[in-house]
């Protein structure tokens, strides 16, 4: 379960599974904006203030981001 005001894990999964070719311009813009907000929220919220699942997800995402 994601923390309040963060993108749910289900929503993130759906966005990744849906091909861009089947998304509207508005959907793509919304995903981009909410994704950027989620990344900022992840960076500015300390791991101690996150739920266990959100902390694990953010750590995994940071690991992936560092590898790219």
Swiss-Prot record:
Signal peptide: none
Keywords: Stress response
UniProt name for this protein: Heat shock protein hsp9
Gene Ontology MF, one: lipid binding
Induction statement: Strongly induced by heat-shock, nitrogen limitation, and upon entry into the stationary phase.
Organism: Schizosaccharomyces pombe (strain 972 / ATCC 24843)
Cellular component terms (Gene Ontology): cytoplasm; cytosol; nucleus; plasma membrane
Gene3D superfamilies, A to Z: 6.10.280.100
């Amino acid at each position: 379960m994601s923390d309040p005001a963060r993108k749910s894990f289900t929503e993130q999964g759906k966005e990744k599974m849906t091909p861009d070719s089947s998304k509207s311009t508005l959907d793509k813009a919304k995903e981009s904006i909410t994704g950027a907000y989620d990344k900022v929220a992840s960076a500015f919220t300390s791991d101690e203030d996150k739920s266990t699942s959100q902390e694990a997800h953010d750590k995994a995402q940071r690991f992936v981001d560092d590898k790219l």
